[in-house]
Amino acid sequence: MARRLFLLLLAVTAGLSLTGTTVRAVGINWGTEASHPLPPSKVVELLKSNGIVKVKLFDADPKVLRALSGSNIGVTIGIQNSMLKSLNASVKVAESWVHDNVTRYFNGGNRVRIEYVAVGEEPFLQSYGNQYKPFVIGAAMNIQNALVKANLANEVKVVVPSSFDSFLSESGRPSSGHFRADLNKTMIELLSFLTKHHSPFFVTISPFLSFHQNKNISLDFSLFKETAKAHKDGRKTYRNSFDLSYDTLVSALFTIGFSEVDIVVSKIGWPTDGAENATSLTAEAFFKGLIVHLEKKTASLPRPPVETYIESLLDEDQRNLSAGNFERHWGVFTFDGQAKYNFSFNHKNQVNAQNVQYLPPKWCVVNNNKDLSNASARALEACAVADCTSILPGGSCSGIRWPGNVSYAFNSLYQQNDHSAESCNFGGLGLITTVDPSEDNCRFSIQLDTSHSSSQTPNFFQSWPLLLLFLLSGLF
């Protein structure tokens, strides 16, 4: 063990001269899983006005890429997991994808500064099993070959975002870090590919999930508080959760022979709703601590990430909830581009999205003059298809009582369906009002008025776990 620790120390110390001691850039993830997404042109204005110089996308939406043209923002475009099998099977499919989603944006004066193609979105997530893993390396190779054929391989690098659970240490000590046993062979293949083509290793670091899943990780330790109890590993002392996870990854890379690969933290964040300690105050404390920590020269990070991408720009009311109700609340900004807390990318004041177009100031609430014996059942129906995560335990609206929480559910469906009168019927129990029913910190939102509105109900099978939670928690 002592020899292994010594070799690991040599490896990370050697990296000091290769990567420097400060983070090169902080970017942000821009997801679009929203029923009423903020128009891409508004989002690009938001990025530029807040000094955000890099953005990571989860797909290659033409509307988004057109909005980014000429912005000089560094862009990572994503390939969804559902495409991996076909990309692995056919070079022609990969060439077609590169032509449609990369090459066309390099032509003309308003080009998009595409820097990376991310093959898959955390395809090694443990809950996926072998659903995507067999196709990842082949898909990445075919995309790489397609970029070579298009004469773009020197400008655009191929990467594969790895999940927070792809590496671990059963003992909790970073020096014992390793990749999951079922991933070892795949990781060696992936890292060999990345090293050959001078591409970085993209990976999620999640102090928030570490805090929620590990009773030995305190909130203060997660938020970079100086008062946090330190964790020791041999002679090394860890004073925050980020360093603990990051060095576990460094050790895992060293263990399989890739200690010098550049690391990009492709996702790191703290949600503001949907779970205990998921608040604007804790998110602000986390990000301020993170940025200060990444910017300062510190011996605790001898090989800092070359880039870091915050999760995420905006809240998204259509995100899958399998990981938790907080999934729809990662945004630094609300769904309509309004800052949730004081945090700056460029050491200046935050700038909100400007001239946002909303639906008229109307809400749907429960009609207290009706027989409400069936109101709870109607609220459950609404929450099966609309976003009600804020009224679940730990949410920002969990404190409002019945029938206020019923009104919240009614309004969520009403807003999602663009104020259609039918969506506020609920068997005669709904009432459309122009009086804002918001209570204290519980905001009854008005949706965006945008031509990009989907006005559709989410897949019920995506929402049924939330419905089950409502039934079990007895909120209604």
Swiss-Prot record:
Keywords: Cell membrane, Cell wall, Cell wall biogenesis/degradation, Disulfide bond, Glycoprotein, Glycosidase, GPI-anchor, Hydrolase, Lipoprotein, Membrane, Plant defense, Secreted, Signal
GO biological process per UniProt: carbohydrate metabolic process; cell wall organization; defense response
E.C. numbers: 3.2.1.39
Gene Ontology MF terms in the entry: glucan endo-1,3-beta-D-glucosidase activity
Domain of life: Eukaryota
Subcellular location: Secreted, Cell wall; Cell membrane
Disulfide bonds, paired cysteine numbers: C364-C424
Gene Ontology cellular component list: extracellular region; plasma membrane; side of membrane
Family: Belongs to the glycosyl hydrolase 17 family.
Name of the protein described by the UniProt record: Glucan endo-1,3-beta-glucosidase 9
Lineage, broadest ranks: Eukaryota, Viridiplantae, Streptophyta, Embryophyta, Tracheophyta
